[in-house]
């Protein structure tokens, strides 16, 4: 999936591409995904449990189209020796964040939106059907749910609170008494 996050110049908060095919060869899938990422200019968050797509992008020189693990999903252990881009799909934190991202998206952008009195958009019926049948305990056959959730996780920006510094101008600049000299 490809997802438009907030943008003043384009439709926002909506999926713009659904890839619902299972080609016979993994390289065909990887090439299709690479072409879509290049065409749309979107970086992708991929599962890094299987290194094939990451290696394919690196081999072709397009590894800048792969996102690293989002900061808000990092743990102290995940920051150590992370060389592979993407995100592990077997981490409980990631599984929960993935499900919550889809749940929040459905609540905020699909169907009737109570606060605004309007109706949200989801143009891909196969993804809607996949979401309806999704079981968090058995995720293997829900490719569209997994890819749409990864797109949402990749688009999330978590606001990092600024820490107030203890900067004190009086301590920083030393003041000397002014003495006048008369000749």
Where are each of the predicted segments found?
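Short alpha-helix plus adjacent loop in nuclease-associated cores
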Residues: 66-112
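RNase H-like, metal-dependent nuclease domains and their acidic two-metal-ion catalytic environment used
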Residues: 1-69, 108-183
């Amino acid at each position: 999936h490809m997802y438009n996050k907030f943008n003043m110049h384009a439709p926002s908060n909506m999926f713009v591409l659904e890839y619902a095919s299972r080609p016979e060869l993994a390289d065909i899938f990887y090439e299709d995904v690479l072409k879509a990422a290049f065409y749309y200019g979107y970086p992708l968050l991929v599962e890094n449990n299987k290194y094939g797509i990451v290696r394919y992008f690196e081999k072709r020189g397009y590894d800048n189209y792969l996102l690293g693990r989002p900061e808000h999903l990092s743990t102290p252990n995940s920051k150590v020796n992370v060389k592979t881009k993407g995100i592990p799909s077997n981490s409980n934190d990631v599984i929960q964040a993935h499900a919550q991202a889809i749940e929040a998206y459905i609540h905020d952008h699909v169907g009737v939106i109570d606060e605004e009195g309007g109706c949200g958009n989801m143009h891909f019926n196969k993804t809607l059907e996949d979401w309806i049948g999704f079981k968090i305990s058995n995720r293997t056959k829900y490719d569209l749910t997994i890819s749409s959730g990864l797109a949402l996780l990749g688009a999330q920006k978590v606001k990092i609170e600024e820490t107030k510094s203890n900067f004190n101008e009086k301590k920083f600049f030393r003041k000397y008494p002014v003495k006048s000299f008369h000749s």
